From Swiss-Prot:
Name the record gives this protein: Calpain-6
Top-level lineage group: Eukaryota
UniProt region (Domain III), positions on chain: 344-495
Gene Ontology molecular function, alphabetical: calcium-dependent cysteine-type endopeptidase activity; microtubule binding
Taxonomic placement: Eukaryota, Metazoa, Chordata, Craniata, Vertebrata
Cysteines joined through disulfide linkages: none
Amino acid sequence: MGPPLKLFKNQKYQELKQECIKDSRLFCDPTFLPENDSLFYNRLLPGKVVWKRPQDICDDPHLIVGNISNHQLTQGRLGHKPMVSAFSCLAVQESHWTKTIPNHKEQEWDPQKTEKYAGIFHFRFWHFGEWTEVVIDDLLPTINGDLVFSFSTSMNEFWNALLEKAYAKLLGCYEALDGLTITDIIVDFTGTLAETVDMQKGRYTELVEEKYKLFGELYKTFTKGGLICCSIESPNQEEQEVETDWGLLKGHTYTMTDIRKIRLGERLVEVFSAEKVYMVRLRNPLGRQEWSGPWSEISEEWQQLTASDRKNLGLVMSDDGEFWMSLEDFCRNFHKLNVCRNVNNPIFGRKELESVLGCWTVDDDPLMNRSGGCYNNRDTFLQNPQYIFTVPEDGHKVIMSLQQKDLRTYRRMGRPDNYIIGFELFKVEMNRKFRLHHLYIQERAGTSTYIDTRTVFLSKYLKKGNYVLVPTMFQHGRTSEFLLRIFSEVPVQLRELTLDMPKMSCWNLARGYPKVVTQITVHSAEDLEKKYANETVNPYLVIKCGKEEVRSPVQKNTVHAIFDTQAIFYRRTTDIPIIVQVWNSRKFCDQFLGQVTLDADPSDCRDLKSLYLRKKGGPTAKVKQGHISFKVISSDDLTEL
């Protein structure tokens, strides 16, 4: 079974269709009438708009003619260019467009059974975390008999015009589509997770390793059903659609339709002086202005391949507007890359995406307030929702996406479309269970852009450990809803931090409720003991307080280890010390290298300290070789840390 389906306006497609067939009438949607209010909020019309059904526009109308990806699309007189690009991208992956256009064969016109046609269609969108079905009639706006929004160059094909109408209904009207980015639209069509890559900032033309790493990510994304598109920045409006020296258009979005690592045969190795080539195939959704550089149809490289070579290598093109180019030229010519990962179907049972709905709310009590504003508001910043997740191993790429609820439907009331939003990421203690209240020792691991777009994201390779993500609006004291999604190749156990301190319970009251909270960061362990000169030392930390302990990752082959390991403990009394032990990880039996014992009283200095290691037995035990550098902070206010 698929995810639960929400019915927009509570309209049930099959019931409405059967009623129309029974009454021998065509459906007219009472919730999205063929009127100017369905077109614009207050914009002047460029001419008289007449709403027509497809059979009144052309002979033999169809939802889809042949292959959905075979025909070019046009944005129309009043249409939206990002919408056409998103349609072209959607058509690349059948698994996506058949979900957005459900039961497309059943919805198709059948000239043999005209009595079964009721002028009603349904489409599905991923709307703020829920798959939502939208029902529409087939009345489309025209001026002088021509569709004013998007249409296909196959003049009797209507899937994109009808899909665009359903999307406009979902968002309020056609004008609500203004300002949407191509990634906004693709995400709404597919539920994918979008990441925008700055090709120039990535320096892929200079850094060979990064270039092939990018290829690997794109290949994996595409073969798993993801959608990818790219564009060339235009510095100003005058250069929009201006052709480059190699035939590409500035400010124009191209869709990736294939990606291949091709091993060349013996004859071709001699021709191209390479054993393999990395290639991408792109499509111009408007079907004009193709690439004219290397590997284009007019290039020397292309001419050196026979038709049989191209077929065997997979260098084929299915329609006009498609072209191949090398990875090097791809990285050199395009500035922005939109990568939309298919995260709806976990691979091999692994949960790659975790998501949570949340909201910014206002309360006079600082511990209850959840609208503290951005990082600039230091006194209130942590009065925002907080989410913790765990990266189980070093070096995993984590993509974090924060989407605010779309307010376009309220535009008629004068409300803004979007607030300025963003988020901060902090590396925190390995055993943190409660909310952050002050940032004393936490590492600021990342920050998103703060901007008034619907979605902001951050992509980072993170070290092993716990991270707290704080989603914020730029200004404090405002309310709204948001959707937080985190994608990683390993489960990260995303959960919200809701409590400020340990709960009062019969159990902890009987044992003694905590009176002191202590935060410790062990920066390093240095000059550690070696029994003989060529011994390998692989140190790690064990930080203990009572029955609770935190263990650091192992540092390989060093007597000068940098840890920056954090822990936090809620203690009944300072009589329960904090013990930091250093161990050497060995194959059969780990070796104890020494420890320090700390009272960690609230009155103690909070600066960085260094202490020699000692044998077991407390702060007066015999000194051993080596010392640790650490910072410890204690407070009798359980909500200070």
